[in-house]
């Protein structure tokens, strides 16, 4: 990877980078234990291991001073009443932040820190979201037919800690209801 300035484009309507180094596809099976309705999860997985989201990474060295960038695409859909979402993560270097720019679609960023504070922010095109150090974060697509597409940037040495979220999930869930989209407490969170 050359140490030179570079550019890339995000051609519309897909907004997939003109250049990327890694394409990650996360399917339903990768989020085992993360959806509230375990029966709906099992039934859906039995039918098909549905593609929930994709990440297009533009790699840089995993070193202080570098910035890693990319595009996250969360597809529309639900497991039971819960919208499709990313796995969510803390950074392995907890004291590192991340910035997201929503390019397309609608959704939420669910965030929490180890001290128990929770914040859920709405995402819509043009909205910039700053995730401070120490905050786990997960993107949730609430669009009915449109992908939630975000551009992200974070320090090269931050790494990812998916394991903590896999063990206990997030404290808040984004659910569909007859009254519309609701943010609810995760009833299983304290049981883990």
Regions found by a protein language model. Name each.
Residues 1-15:
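N-terminal capping/interface segment
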Residues 114, 134-135:
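Short beta->alpha connector loops
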Residues 17-121, 140-192:
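Active-site region of the double-stranded beta-helix
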Residues 130, 136-138:
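Hydrophobic beta-strand signal
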